């Protein structure tokens, strides 16, 4: 890895940042992180306004950035430094002018945030750099010394695209926010459609990539979807209408069809939303309403994910551009399994453009595979979820396995989504699906009922838990009643969706198999907890919704405090797990975050109070502190607020608030709906495996690294710190230095780096 001196005897290293191509929510978070991380590391950031057009124009379009220039932009959509198409940059003369203007400012390092077109143009510019310098020296536009000082152009690309169409990265900046817009719209359309028993055709973006239509179809519970990677077969009109009719017969009151703006049939002929509506009317005589979502998908406030992940990418981009792994290769920093990953820029661009060629060649399986494993899995899941039971390949029989679903522990948004997915996917396997009302107490009271395909209609959109959930862990005295209920209802397996108390309940129950043999059945634990404190799961169902709820509340707290000089101390849930606190701190722009994991001392609080006062003396108007609800037995929210108030001496006031149960409420986020669906699909696969092998084992599953892992419950304490009720391994703690770097201005210093993984292949 080449080591670059951040400062020279005369001036600091200068880093340019620009946004190019279509705007995407989260670009501002990335720009903010680049600017502030560069300053924290002693480099000088420059904003190149309006993308490459600003570089071609030069002068005032290349602006030196200060810490305050990046203030107040984290929660804004679009890009505050602008983006524009630049035909001039496509020509050599335009790139030549851009090179001159960058050299005039002393910039030879660029963080470029854009799509594949912007990034490929950037790579062409990089390969020409030496030629531009030579010609500029010959023209007398720059000196030989300037050319020698900037012999090489360093490039790091960040992918900004709401379509999520870059091969090699799980997510692109803006995709999660766009999915939020679409799913919100589907939820709202579904309610009016159900009222009138109507059919809606919803057109979403995704000219060449089916991520948005496919994921919104799964998360929104759509009946039919058209994606570029899986073009419609001949006779699609009749198949679609049959699917919708059978769905209505099975209990649906509304029909939702999702179509990508780039959808085609297998001959490459475009299929528009109007084509679909016309085909529906020809075969049913009924009108289908058309809603084209358009640019609402691109605008508005970024989601929590697009804030914290874009901040992470911006931080890592500065780290990479100052110490490039290979200075001769332009790289993209993408995301794989929530880890920053280094990807060769041009190879990623070629692979991305190659998907279009695969579609044209009719190799649709390869086109889907290029989108990643999660995409191909979700294609199959969507087919199963949307297929009415009368069209299912495995209708339930008298000898069908009876699988019961139970919720336990604290409420987590997405529990209903998990139950819906379990019922419909289980029925597709030919099983009889049962619901247990009222958690373990309900099972003991024999509150067990069969759940049919239409019983769970609409559950995907709802917060709460239709089956109910309770926190108490059953005692040994209740085991007999639980065992009798399992036997009486002929339950062959249990799907337990819940939090840590659910895990502990299963652990304790299965330790008594000799005395209570009824518990000797396959049991799969599915993680659902806003605390994100469960073993063997990097993210639990409900965590993303809680994070978005918290960030929404913190945004409003900041607005309320902005009218006067104020410090606000906000308390978040999580018990002794600081995930919500740290991630909401990064996503909301908090200055301080206090976590149970860090054992804050009184001396540190005293130092923080002095620094807080100094910032207000320097002109600050707002200061946000986030604290975990169990950060410390003594140094809690009220204590911190009192200390900061005592230090203020009237310079500013201090308010505190516990965000409370709003973090548990509301409809589950798109991510939580998709996570719940994927985990349930994997859980049913585990049950299928146990049934076929004659095994009866209690296990817990979760997304870890690049796969959903299955682990035995009897080894659970290998992963779990029971004293603090959280996992030993908490991946998100590696992000702690980022909050420090981008939230509080200080003297340039060494920053603890984040780990940047190297992509070994494009299979992810």
Predicted segment positions?
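N-terminal phosphate-binding or glycine-rich loops at protein starts, especially the Walker A/P-loop
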Residues: 2-59, 397-444
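Glycine-rich oxoanion-binding loops at beta->alpha junctions
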Residues: 2-8, 56-110, 119, 145, ...
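Short glycine-rich or small-residue beta-strand-to-loop segments that form or flank ligand, phosphate
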Residues: 14-22, 79-84, 108-114, 157, ...
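Short, ordered loop/turn segments at secondary-structure junctions
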Residues: 20-23, 48-54, 85-86, 115-118, ...
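Short glycine/serine/threonine-rich phosphate/pyrophosphate-binding segments
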Residues: 24-34, 55-56, 91-96, 116-124, ...
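Accessory alpha-helical/coil subdomains and C-terminal extensions
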Residues: 45, 112-114, 120-154, 172-290, ...
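C-terminal non-catalytic interaction/assembly regions of soluble proteins
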Residues: 272-397, 641-764
